[in-house]
């Protein structure tokens, strides 16, 4: 399938070419998938990158926008995003959270509902791959949140590029992309992204952590070294899990032998 002219024009930019190349190194799926689009810079950049990838690889790709109805303007925003994506032949469907909204734990419950809706859509279409826009800043935030909660090794490195959740593969191809690069793609391609006011609300733990990380960065935190630390912890966790599995198999074999 040919890449539409308006998408080809966007690909003529050198920085876009470089970011697309990096994306293709991290995304090697060869079957149909669903992409979650919120309207933020990360998910709009993901919509653009996956669209190019799906055309190049002749793959079926569906785009889903979830309207949580937590803000009065959310429905208009969802419609605007759908229209904007359509300009680039990215066909999106809007799913709506219709139930009564809770007064407490709103962010975590909205996240759970979003995944419920997305997983249902995956099952409806018999698609096992769901692609989401978590990026490097999310990886750092998740690490610090888990550390504050006293998580063990597995919890500290829980944000993986591929996570199996029942029958669904949750895929995060942007984990080594910085937020500023995703903002660049969104601005350059769509000249738009949604600024969610909850991203500035310091009553939410994630926003407090984000501000602390930014303070660390301003005081010399080396993001490359932090990324390397998380990468090394992941390797340690993988090694540990490997030996646990080996030990289980060995004990299972010995149990069978003893019973004989």
Regions from the PLM with identified roles:
Residues 1-212:
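Core alpha/beta nucleotide-donor-binding catalytic domains of modification enzymes
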Residues 165, 203-260:
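ATP/NTP-dependent adenylation/nucleotidyl-transfer catalytic domains that generate, transfer
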